[in-house]
């Protein structure tokens, strides 16, 4: 890589489904899914803490007909991730589950049920088609970002895509028995070096790979390193991105037998960069897991990705960052902007016009367009919320219309 006249490094990390923070996310989203399965309009905001021998679930819920067995849901989630033995220090059967869930604040509920705009409308105005999605207000204030880039087929930044691939591969090899000594907790980090910005670089390589994986007590670090180099890295990292200068740090701290909630306390919402774009772009600060789609922290971040991805898929830019901001209790965003980093085939101002014409970022409209009141969230909890075709916000169904409108 020394031949590069300019060297720019881009690093992203991923953590496995058994990482304590990700386990907390998975529990929270499993509870959310069960409420939505029983009652799609449930309001849910659930946080989870996991530590040695204990899980604590707290939050606010509003549901009229749903009756969720929280204890059962938590234990089933822990079982699915792989904490099945008491000697892990945390397991599905014997760990305690403490529940402190109460009803959603009626003041917040009122502002979400009927937005400020809706309350100010006459009955005649409420019947107009353009106001159909104005009834529901945003569940909180805040700013959310969505991003897309043409550096990978899934229109995601390369470093985070590679890092997620490594942790997903570790889970596959653990679950299929190929590497039986692997345990649920793991992390991976990938540093990519380029001779310029992602959209202008002509040379790209992987500079550094870091893998830290929990393991049984009876395996050597030499064996782990050999298996990572044989079974994990080649299955994920394209050979053309590796060279003789690529560095590999495999369990650089040494033994990693004590892991998961027994090694570190986990909390919902602590891996927001892992969940999104790996640090490639700004983050508004709001976490996703455990929140129903009236919470714009989640739904608007998904929608911003949807908008950005369609812009890039339409060929209107090589990179697109979309920012949406809200006021609590109001339906319409207070602001929406796009930044294409100078890669647009039309101006950012033109893209603003196209977004206004082809997208609707009111919370109720987002929920309807992406069909978000479904039990689809537990599967988002690990390996990133973006770049995965199974999710509705990854559709590029508006790209052609955007392209045609831009040419018109």
Curated annotation (Swiss-Prot):
Gene3D superfamilies: 3.30.300.10. Mg(2+) binds at residue 21. One of its GO terms (cellular component) is cytosol. SUPFAM superfamilies: S-adenosylmethionine synthetase (SSF55973). It is found in: Cytoplasm. ATP binds at residues 19, 185-187, 255-256, 264, 270-271, 287, 291. Its EC number is 2.5.1.6. It catalyses: L-methionine + ATP + H2O = S-adenosyl-L-methionine + phosphate + diphosphate. Its cofactor is Mg(2+); K(+). Keywords: ATP-binding, Cytoplasm, Magnesium, Metal-binding, Nucleotide-binding, One-carbon metabolism, Potassium, Transferase. L-methionine binds at residues 60, 104, 264, 295. K(+) binds at residue 47. Residues 104-114 are annotated as: Flexible loop. CDD domains: S-AdoMet_synt. Pfam families: S-AdoMet_synt_C, S-AdoMet_synt_M, S-AdoMet_synt_N. Belongs to the AdoMet synthase family. Catalyzes the formation of S-adenosylmethionine (AdoMet) from methionine and ATP. The overall synthetic reaction is composed of two sequential steps, AdoMet formation and the subsequent tripolyphosphate hydrolysis which occurs prior to release of AdoMet from the enzyme. Homotetramer; dimer of dimers. This is S-adenosylmethionine synthase. It comes from Deinococcus radiodurans (strain ATCC 13939 / DSM 20539 / JCM 16871 / CCUG 27074 / LMG 4051 / NBRC 15346 / NCIMB 9279 / VKM B-1422 / R1). The gene is metK.
């Amino acid at each position: 890589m020394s031949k590069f006249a300019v060297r720019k490094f881009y690093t992203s990390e991923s953590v496995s489904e058994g990482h304590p923070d990700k386990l907390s996310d998975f529990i929270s989203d499993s509870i959310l899914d069960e409420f939505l399965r029983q009652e799609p309009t449930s309001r849910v905001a659930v946080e989870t803490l996991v530590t040695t021998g204990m899980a604590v679930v707290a939050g606010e819920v509003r549901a009229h007909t749903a009756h969720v067995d929280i204890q059962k849901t938590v234990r089933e989630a822990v079982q699915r991730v792989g904490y099945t033995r008491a000697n892990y220090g945390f397991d599905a059967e014997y760990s305690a589950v403490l529940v402190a869930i109460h009803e959603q604040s009626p003041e917040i509920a009122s502002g979400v049920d009927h937005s400020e705009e809706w309350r100010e409308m006459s009955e005649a105005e409420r019947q107009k088609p353009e106001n159909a999605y104005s009834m529901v207000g945003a569940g909180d204030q805040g700013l959310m970002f969505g991003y897309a880039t043409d550096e990978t087929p899934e229109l995601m930044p390369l470093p985070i895509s590679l890092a997620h691939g490594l942790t997903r591969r570790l889970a596959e090899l653990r679950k299929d028995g190929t590497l039986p000594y692997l345990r649920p907790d793991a992390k991976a980090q990938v540093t990519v070096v380029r001779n310029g910005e992602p959209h202008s670089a002509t040379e790209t390589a992987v500079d550094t790979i870091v893998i830290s994986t929990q393991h049984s007590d009876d395996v050597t670090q030499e064996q782990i390193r050999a298996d990572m180099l044989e079974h994990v890295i080649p299955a994920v990292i394209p050979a053309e991105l590796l060279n003789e200068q690529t560095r590999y740090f495999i369990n650089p701290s040494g033994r990693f037998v004590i892991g998961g909630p027994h090694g570190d306390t986990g909390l919902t919402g602590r891996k927001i960069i892992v969940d999104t774009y790996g640090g490639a772009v700004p983050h508004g600060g709001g976490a996703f897991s455990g929140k129903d789609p009236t919470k714009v922290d989640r739904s608007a971040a998904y929608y911003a990705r949807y908008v950005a991805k369609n812009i890039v898929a339409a060929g209107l830019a090589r990179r697109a960052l979309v920012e949406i901001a809200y006021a609590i209790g109001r339906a319409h965003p207070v602001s929406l902007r796009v930044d294409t980093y100078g890669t647009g085939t039309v101006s950012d101002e033109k893209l603003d016009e196209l977004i206004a014409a082809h997208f609707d970022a009111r919370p109720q409209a987002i929920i309807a367009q992406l069909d978000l009141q479904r039990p689809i969230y537990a599967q988002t909890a690990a390996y990133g919320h973006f770049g995965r075709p199974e999710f509705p916000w990854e559709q590029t169904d508006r790209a052609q219309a955007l392209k045609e409108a831009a040419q018109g």
